């Protein structure tokens, strides 16, 4: 269920876990960015929610959107139930699509340290970090009622045999 402000009421418990979303059906909406900062983020979230509603698709976690940033273009990803919709925005995520999750009790201004720690943990396990996805669990309207700012950080990774050889096993 989606709250009145647009935030997800329920979200997956992916804190400090590895998740494989490979083969999951997703609605992917490209969004404009400027220096990795989304432009009109709320309006694109609303547009994506409206498109999913018009297509009569069912989200796995209603209201939860993953945002991937880029210098000038990013994307919003919402996981949906398997669908045979002819929409050009419905795609299946590639296999493998390994992610390391981290529930950060803060907003975008304080994610530097947890992202760095997550990256070091992945490197210690012989995994190469790839792109970073953000999912805002709370917004500026509901964070006080829901226990403060919460941001789900998801770092995509791939196994690296070369890196595994270089990393000494922890005893």
Label each PLM-derived region with a short phrase.
Residues 1-171:
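A solvent-exposed interaction/effector surface
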